[in-house]
Amino acid sequence: MVGPSGESMPRNFKPETIALHGGQEPDPTTTSRAVPLYQTTSYVFKDTDHAARLFGLQEFGNIYTRLMNPTTDVLEKRVAALEGGVAALATASGQSAEMLALLNIVEAGQEIVASSSLYGGTYNLLHYTFPKLGIKVHFVDQSDPENFRKASNDKTRAFYAETLGNPKLDTLDIAAVSKVAKEVGVPLVIDNTMPSPYLVNPLKHGADIVVHSLTKFLGGHGTSIGGIIIDGGSFNWGNGKFKNFTEPDPSYHGLKFWEVFGKFEPFGGVNIAFILKARVQGLRDLGPAISPFNAWQILQGVETLPLRMERHSGNALKVAEFLQKHPKIEWVNYPGLSTDKNYATAKKYHERGLFGAIVGFEIKGGVEKAKKFIDGLELFSLLANIGDAKSLAIHPASTTHQQLTGPEQISAGVTPGFVRLSVGLENIDDILVDLEEALKNI
């Protein structure tokens, strides 16, 4: 069994099986069952003609690990299969994945419409760095999909949002925003890190491109940094708005990505124009390649993704229910609570009835009480990550979203007493005792 990118998948396997087998056949030389770690920089060509064909994109194969690697290739195929995409590109971090995905589409003088409910690092990238590259970003309230249309103009080239806003946990109506994107004629790019592909598949609901921080739930153990871009193969890059796909690329002697790879017969006639351009232009020139070792470690995490997400979700729901009843808590955000304002939308997209590991809540008394609560936790670790097997806690206003202004923080759902938990896999009784003890002392 292997995954996307032209390899046959003889049966329509379920996600639990894909997580273990996708993208791989046992190594034909060594017969190794586990995915081998190819810790190498480069690869021997058969002869000079073979090398020339590879460099000219007349044949696909390994050239240099900045562009591709056999271990990383398995990871890419496996995650693409989990998301229902045609192909994927792994990168050095989630931040580099979203950067490459957007720069593969948008050029200087063009614009992006993005949700304002974003991870702080993403907001900084779009708000501060992209304008330095000549790219303007309009931030909108995603609760009304029409806001994306209202902020669009003839320079708009992409819509960007997160499935679940981090840390606000507002659920994007993917299908509704996708409808607007299609009418405007631009791709919808979705960060699906928070729910993982086991809980939500944005491509199924109309997204065109999906990105992940592999560091989080796909890796799952807080050991390795990585990111990934998944191409749904659904977008028409030849609609007249994307000259970077339809005009000749001088660095490949006039090759036109849409013309050659928009319906690529060696891959079964699928559209791989976006993901191939991201690899052979963006990754080639900007260079944020994932290390083979990190790819190998993340693969170990992917194998247990379904099991972990079920436990994460079960524990998080119990935590949310506990906090909702506690007298020292002002309010709780968790899309799995039937009382949550996002519950109906979340239920529409979380088809398994599982809503992930992240719980947000406001402690009565504001910032000082929130800090005292976090400092009183013993089982939870205070650190800037989510998706670890261990339970984590953070105060976003003073950390992940510190560089935002007050109004920007509020727009992102970050209030002074707001705490974000990434609920781990520990015994739920131990988790609840730790929370109760910390709350007693504030």
Curated annotation (Swiss-Prot):
Q: Which Pfam families match?
A: Cys_Met_Meta_PP
Sites where N6-(pyridoxal phosphate)lysine occurs are at 216
InterPro entries under this entry?
Cys/Met-Metab_PyrdxlP-dep_enz, Cys_met_metab_PP, OAc-hSer/O-AcSer_sulfhydrylase, PyrdxlP-dep_Trfase, PyrdxlP-dep_Trfase_major, PyrdxlP-dep_Trfase_small
- Pathway the protein contributes to: Amino-acid biosynthesis; L-methionine biosynthesis via de novo pathway; L-homocysteine from O-acetyl-L-homoserine: step 1/1
Gene Ontology molecular function: cysteine synthase activity; O-acetylhomoserine sulfhydrylase activity; pyridoxal phosphate binding
- PROSITE patterns xref list: CYS_MET_METAB_PP
Q: Which domain of life is it from?
A: Bacteria
A GO term from the CC aspect = cytoplasm
What does its activity-regulation comment describe? Answer: Feedback inhibited at very high concentrations of methionine or S-adenosylmethionine.
Q: Name one GO biological process term.
A: cysteine biosynthetic process from serine
EC number, UniProt record: 2.5.1.-
Q: Which reaction does it catalyse?
A: O-acetyl-L-homoserine + hydrogen sulfide = L-homocysteine + acetate
Q: Where is this region: Disordered?
A: 1-32
Locate the transmembrane regions by residue number.
none
- Describe the function of this protein: Catalyzes the conversion of O-acetyl-L-homoserine (OAH) into homocysteine in the methionine biosynthesis pathway. Can also use O-succinyl-homoserine (OSH), although at low efficiency.
Q: Which PANTHER family match?
A: HOMOCYSTEINE/CYSTEINE SYNTHASE, HOMOCYSTEINE_CYSTEINE SYNTHASE
Record's protein name: O-acetyl-L-homoserine sulfhydrylase
What is the source species? Leptospira meyeri
Gene of this entry = metY
